[in-house]
Amino acid sequence: VGVMIQRPPTIRGLSLRHMIEICGATPQETEQMARWMGLADFLDRSVNEGFSGGELKRSELLQLMAQKPDLLLLDEPESGVDVENIALVGRAANYILHNEPCGGTGCDKPCCAHNLDCDTYNPLSSQRSGLIITHVGHILKYVPASHAHILYQGTLSCTSGDPLDVLSCISKTGYEKCVNGGCRRGMK
């Protein structure tokens, strides 16, 4: 199980590089993944020390990429992240879940939003699962999700086969309509 929390701790004295290798990456994989995540210059710094919001998210995702969890839990991945980093967070989460290179035209980057129509991309090919807790849903532009559930006052109040339908319903009519069954009835 791999977990990305809203505010990860700083770990002074442990370099990000060492942490990634503890998670299971080889030195070469560590360098390559750090470049993908824009963190190559951070590898020899203490884990999360002095990192911005976006850097924290990227650091956590880098650790999760090395860990290769069977179950990925993301708690508000958009929290404290600018638009540019949301795209990177989403692509990294998608890579963790599917762990597939693009396979098209010599691309060796993680399969991500810019190459989702790649011939070899199949979001259902992975045996990995994920749970994403989100309030704004921006992450759904990058991570294909199969179901949406709304937890409201401790009760699972709305369930749908299409997360984008639920998000659209909430955006247009608010949580109240969804909680009262509007999203389940196909209201958008």
Question: Model-derived features: where do they sit?
Answer:
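ABC ATPase nucleotide-binding domain signature region
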Residues: 1-28, 135
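Conserved ABC ATPase "signature" region
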Residues: 28-46
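Walker B catalytic motif
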Residues: 76-77, 82-84
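Helical segment within the ABC ATPase nucleotide-binding domain
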Residues: 86-126
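Conserved beta-strand-loop-alpha-helix hinge in the C-terminal portion
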Residues: 142, 147, 151-181
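Hydrophobic anchor residue at the start of the ABC signature
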Residues: 60-61, 81
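Conserved catalytic motifs of ABC-family nucleotide-binding domains
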Residues: 68
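ABC ATPase C-loop
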Residues: 64-65
